[in-house]
């Protein structure tokens, strides 16, 4: 039986692509383990899946000054030692890393054990963790073809983004029943990321009187961001977040308004949902979401509304443009074949 160790964490985006791949390897009887941090989101997600999970020390890698920068390099070194010992015991045939700060010690620990390491980079430019890790990797899979110019050409394999199978299996009838929506108006699903987005939430709520004339709204507003005064508003449903219901919600969704995190927007792409993308600004991120969104706009998948331009008027304008040009967007979206991503990655894992 072949063995594989997965790693990646710090945010859900560094875990969900692994969840898209793991079931396919389970079908092929791979022995699967996961190495992550002691308290990261990856621990909660992976343990729910019943996959053996091993914790290591980890320190955050920062591009800015912080007093924790003094302590964290020592935590990374401790993490490398922890990972080295764990990998030596597990004896995997290959390691698959999705990035995030916890992945660096695992990648180095794997390299020291002479285990082939495969990376996956979701964004147009590599994050700091993958920038460090790629020198220890034999291959790096990229979601965007444009990402290749930022990486060693001999290691790069373009795959697109692996999408979880359950996202593609939503039931329209269940979605309508869950939300209490009618079939008569189009549905817009609005997502601000796992923590929500204050400006998006406020603007959407200000725009509701106009939007609800033509659309039904599902608003995933993030933890602590519900507006109690809108709980019973007809045609509007708000949630902090959803889990098992998301595929059914997406099944009835006509348009999406979202941040531009790579994993989420590739799920919308695979489901052929036209998008208004509101990327995180350069002041709040390293600018990767802006590049992601602009790439989707160039390919005709989405319309980009920059954070600094978000107003009630601009939001409604972008939604109307999406609605009026729906067929044009659908034609572009149909050209993408999301199923090839997992097949390509599985093939290279098997050959490692």
UniProtKB/Swiss-Prot annotation:
CDD domains, A to Z: GT28_MurG
Alphabetical keyword list: Cell cycle, Cell division, Cell membrane, Cell shape, Cell wall biogenesis/degradation, Glycosyltransferase, Membrane, Peptidoglycan synthesis, Transferase
Any one of the GO CC terms: plasma membrane
Topology of the protein relative to the lipid bilayer: Peripheral membrane protein
Catalysed conversion reaction: di-trans,octa-cis-undecaprenyl diphospho-N-acetyl-alpha-D-muramoyl-L-alanyl-D-glutamyl-meso-2,6-diaminopimeloyl-D-alanyl-D-alanine + UDP-N-acetyl-alpha-D-glucosamine = di-trans,octa-cis-undecaprenyl diphospho-[N-acetyl-alpha-D-glucosaminyl-(1->4)]-N-acetyl-alpha-D-muramoyl-L-alanyl-D-glutamyl-meso-2,6-diaminopimeloyl-D-alanyl-D-alanine + UDP + H(+)
An annotated GO BP: regulation of cell shape
Enzyme Commission number, as recorded: 2.4.1.227
Pathway: Cell wall biogenesis; peptidoglycan biosynthesis
GO-annotated molecular function: UDP-N-acetyl-D-glucosamine:N-acetylmuramoyl-L-alanyl-D-glutamyl-meso-2,6-diaminopimelyl-D-alanyl-D-alanine-diphosphoundecaprenol 4-beta-N-acetylglucosaminlytransferase activity; undecaprenyldiphospho-muramoylpentapeptide beta-N-acetylglucosaminyltransferase activity
Places the protein is found: Cell membrane
Principal cellular location given in the protein's record: membrane
Source species, domain of life: Bacteria
Enzyme class: transferase
Binding sites annotated in the UniProt record for UDP-N-acetyl-alpha-D-glucosamine: 11-13, 164, 194, 289
Matching InterPro entries: GlcNAc_MurG, Glyco_trans_28_C, GlycoTrans_28_N
HAMAP family in alphabetical order: MurG
Family: Belongs to the glycosyltransferase 28 family. MurG subfamily.
Function of the protein: Cell wall formation. Catalyzes the transfer of a GlcNAc subunit on undecaprenyl-pyrophosphoryl-MurNAc-pentapeptide (lipid intermediate I) to form undecaprenyl-pyrophosphoryl-MurNAc-(pentapeptide)GlcNAc (lipid intermediate II).
Name used for this protein in its record: UDP-N-acetylglucosamine--N-acetylmuramyl-(pentapeptide) pyrophosphoryl-undecaprenol N-acetylglucosamine transferase 2
Organism: Bacillus cereus (strain ATCC 10987 / NRS 248)
């Amino acid at each position: 039986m072949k063995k594989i160790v997965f790693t990646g964490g710090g945010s859900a985006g560094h875990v969900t692509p692994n969840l898209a791949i793991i079931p396919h390897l389970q079908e092929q009887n791979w022995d699967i383990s996961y190495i992550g941090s002691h308290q990261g989101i990856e621990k909660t997600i992976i343990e729910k899946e019943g996959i053996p999970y091993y914790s290591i020390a980890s320190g955050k890698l920062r591009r800015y000054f912080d007093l924790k920068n003094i302590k964290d390099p020592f935590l990374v070194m401790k993490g490398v030692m922890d990972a080295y010992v764990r990998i030596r015991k597990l004896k995997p045939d290959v390691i698959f890393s999705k990035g995030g700060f916890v992945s660096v010690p695992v990648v180095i620990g794997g390299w020291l054990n002479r285990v082939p390491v495969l990376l996956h980079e979701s964004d147009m430019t590599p994050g700091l963790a993958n920038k460090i890790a790629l020198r220890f990797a034999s291959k790096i899979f990229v979601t965007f073809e444009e990402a290749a110019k930022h990486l060693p050409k001999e290691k790069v394999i373009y795959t697109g983004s692996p999408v979880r199978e359950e996202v593609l299996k939503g039931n329209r009838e269940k979605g309508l029943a869950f939300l209490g929506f009618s079939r008569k108006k189009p549905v817009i699903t609005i997502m601000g990321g796992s923590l929500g987005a204050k400006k998006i939430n406020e603007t959407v709520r200000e725009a509701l009187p106009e939007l609800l004339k033509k659309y039904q709204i599902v608003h995933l507003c993030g933890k602590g961001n519900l507006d109690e005064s809108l709980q019973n508003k007809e045609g509007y449903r708000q949630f902090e977040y959803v889990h098992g219901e998301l595929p059914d919600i997406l099944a009835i969704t006509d348009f999406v308004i979202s941040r531009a995190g790579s994993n989420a927007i590739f799920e919308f792409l695979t489901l052929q949902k036209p998008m208004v993308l509101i990327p995180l600004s350069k002041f709040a991120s390293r600018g990767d979401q802006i590049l992601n969104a602009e790439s989707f706009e160039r390919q005709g998948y989405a319309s980009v509304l920059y954070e600094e331009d978000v107003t009630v008027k601009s939001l409604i304008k972008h939604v109307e443009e999406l609605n009026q040009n729906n067929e044009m967007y659908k034609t572009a979206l149909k050209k993408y074949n999301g199923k090839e991503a997992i097949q390509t990655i599985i093939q290279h894992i098997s050959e490692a």
